[in-house]
């Protein structure tokens, strides 16, 4: 009898264990929940320091979940993880019980006095669950600066409003500005940028002057305003497409950029009417736009005056004036010796239309292109294309 009871107990234990193992949620729709989608270490360090933050990972389902967790960065990452008590950069088959959670502790070590430390330190914790991938972003401030970190989103665009409606804001040169995501000047807002100010933009980020907003960049010959990527190592100084663009919509006043250096973007400046023309223009003077992976200057049905600028070494066009508009370009140098790939496009391109998703947008085009230098490594560096349904006038001399 005792032996029978022992066997019965053993069978019950095995059955209970087996039932538990079957209580696994393995459907393809599995999505974990997180206490935060981005962990920000927002302390500006003045000495070598470390700080730890906590991420809670929730299993919202009635069954247990197994997930793989790993840090995407290489072994030189500034971040380290402790996953539910285990120090590891990668851990597979981490079990999260039903309706329960685990803790991940994230640590960052920063030396802000090291000049080569990036302005922004970033990495990603990736979760792979039942074939689904989810990310939690890590962000730390590497050097002393003014950091602009998004607090809202529009579709896939994360942004922070730096000048709200009716607000005028001035950026000064005392400390650099670091943009993560997009910095937005809202409608009827105005951003002034003083001479000598440095703006570092993280990958895929940019500056957006929304319709009705206004940008005044007030650089000087001795102290230009610099826009560039946030990687400061020597290796990245000649790298293309480190950030996205300066995007300027129709302004409540003239947008003015004087003595600026805009480098290493995908598109240096994109000026376009988003809704309806307000009768104001973009004035670009004494500035340098260089090393854009796409276009240096792209305009769509805009009014632009450009004097004494250098636009150089772009992967597509240095200047593309499209979808109509009114343009004056005088005493500019366009130089294109882009060498990172094959460039099939001319350095300068004019058109009175623009096609998006097989839809043609067409407007009258007028351009005075006077006393400019155009040079490049392609046989043909200047091209025009137009539709006869709208006016096309190009005065080139």
Per-range role (PLM):
Residues 4-14:
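Sec-dependent N-terminal signal peptides
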Residues 16-18:
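C-terminal motif of bacterial Sec signal peptides marking the signal peptidase cleavage site
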Residues 20-26, 32, 36-43, 48-50, ...:
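Beta-strand/loop edge motif enriched in small/polar residues
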Residues 50-52, 62-67:
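Short acidic/proline- and small/hydrophobic-mixed sequence motifs that coincide with surface turns
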Residues 57-61:
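Asparagine-centered strand-capping/turn motif at beta-strand->loop junctions
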Residues 69-70, 121:
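Short coil/turn segments at secondary-structure boundaries
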Residues 72-90:
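Short, solvent-exposed loop/linker segments at beta-strand-coil boundaries, enriched for Pro/Gly
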């Amino acid at each position: 009898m005792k032996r029978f009871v022992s066997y019965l107990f053993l069978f019950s234990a095995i059955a209970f264990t087996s039932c538990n193992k079957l209580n696994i949620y393995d459907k393809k729709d599995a999505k974990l929940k997180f206490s935060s989608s981005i962990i920000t270490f927002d302390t500006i360090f003045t000495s070598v320091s470390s700080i730890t933050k906590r991420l809670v990972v929730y299993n919202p389902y009635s069954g247990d979940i197994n997930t793989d967790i790993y840090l995407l960065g290489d072994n030189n990452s500034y971040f380290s993880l402790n996953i539910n008590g285990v120090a590891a950069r990668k851990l597979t088959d981490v079990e999260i019980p039903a309706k329960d959670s685990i803790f991940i502790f994230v640590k960052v070590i920063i030396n802000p006095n090291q000049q080569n430390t990036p302005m922004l330190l970033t990495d990603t914790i990736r979760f792979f669950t039942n074939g689904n991938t989810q990310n939690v972003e890590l962000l730390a401030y590497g050097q002393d600066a003014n950091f602009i970190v998004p607090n809202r989103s529009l579709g896939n665009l994360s942004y922070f409003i730096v000048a709200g409606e009716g607000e005028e804001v001035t950026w000064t040169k005392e400390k650099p500005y670091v943009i993560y995501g997009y910095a937005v000047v809202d409608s009827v807002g105005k951003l002034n940028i003083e001479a000598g100010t440095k703006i570092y933009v993280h990958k895929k980020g940019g500056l957006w002057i929304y319709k009705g907003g206004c940008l005044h960049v007030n650089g000087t010959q001795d102290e230009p305003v610099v826009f560039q990527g946030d990687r400061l190592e020597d290796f990245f100084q000649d790298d293309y497409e480190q950030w996205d663009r300066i995007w300027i919509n129709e302004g409540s006043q003239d947008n003015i950029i004087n003595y600026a250096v805009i480098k290493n973007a995908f598109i240096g400046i994109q000026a376009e009417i988003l809704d309806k023309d307000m009768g104001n223009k973009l004035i670009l003077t004494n500035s340098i736009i260089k090393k854009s992976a796409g276009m240096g200057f792209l305009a769509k049905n805009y009014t632009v005056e450009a004097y004494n600028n250098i636009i150089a070494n772009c992967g597509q066009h240095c200047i593309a004036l499209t979808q109509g508009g009114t343009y004056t370009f005088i005493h500019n140098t366009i130089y294109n010796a882009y060498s990172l790939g094959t460039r099939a496009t001319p350095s300068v391109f004019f058109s009175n239309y623009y096609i998006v998703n097989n839809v043609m947008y067409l407007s009258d085009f007028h351009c005075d292109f006077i006393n400019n230098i155009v040079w490049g490594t392609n046989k043909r560096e200047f091209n025009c294309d137009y539709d006869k349904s709208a006016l096309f006038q190009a005065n080139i001399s």
